[in-house]
């Protein structure tokens, strides 16, 4: 199910309680997965959500999912009229910043094998539920390279 398509203006910030959602863009006839939302995480086309400009990305569910969501106007109202809303905004911003910073550091400092192992440790069930091509894209390798990583890891165990 597509939640946000390219050229849409993102209106929702989702908090997943079940299921998996991915954020991606298409380039040169292939999809590049930027983010995978897991249970207990927020996901959105956040730049479009904040700027109210058209999205360059697609947000789609990979499995059946359940979520809570805030619309842009909901959050504006909460921020303006409640002190806990301001705290919520700060926490959301911090969580998104930390996630992006950790993801960037992962690509700069870790090998694809280490990124795969990190993902496996954080979300072991995901390896079985999500098509390998999306996992490969998420860790920055081709599906063939992911197959080689998995084969090497299973040989060493």
Feature annotation, model-predicted:
Residues 1-14, 18:
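Regulatory nucleotide-sensing modules
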Residues 6, 24, 45-46, 77-78, ...:
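Residues that scaffold the ATP/ADP-binding catalytic core of kinase and kinase-like folds
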Residues 18, 39, 64, 72, ...:
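ATP/adenylate-binding site constellation spanning eukaryotic-like Ser/Thr protein kinases
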Residues 20-24, 66-67:
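Short beta-strand segments in beta-sandwich/barrel cores
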Residues 25-30:
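Cytochrome P450 core scaffold surrounding the K-helix E-X-X-R motif
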Residues 32-91:
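Cyclic-nucleotide recognition modules
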Residues 96-105:
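Short, Lys/Arg-enriched N-terminal segment that forms or immediately precedes the first helix
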Residues 110-157:
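Phosphate-/nucleic-acid-contacting segments
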């Amino acid at each position: 199910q597509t939640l946000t398509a390219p050229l849409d203006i993102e209106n929702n910030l989702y908090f997943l309680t079940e299921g998996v959602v991915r954020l991606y863009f298409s380039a040169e006839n292939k999809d590049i997965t930027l983010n995978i939302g897991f249970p207990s995480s927020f996901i959105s086309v956040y730049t479009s959500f904040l700027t109210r400009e058209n999205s360059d990305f697609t947000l789609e569910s990979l499995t059946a999912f359940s979520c809570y969501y805030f619309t842009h106007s909901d959050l504006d109202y909460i921020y303006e009229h409640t002190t806990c809303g301001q705290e919520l905004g700060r926490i959301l911003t911090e969580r998104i910043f930390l996630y992006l910073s950790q993801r960037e550091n992962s690509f700069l400092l870790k090998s694809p094998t280490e990124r795969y192992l990190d993902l496996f440790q954080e979300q072991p069930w995901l390896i079985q539920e999500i098509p390998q091509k999306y996992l490969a894209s998420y860790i920055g390798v081709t599906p063939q390279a992911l197959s080689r990583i998995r084969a090497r890891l299973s040989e060493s165990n």
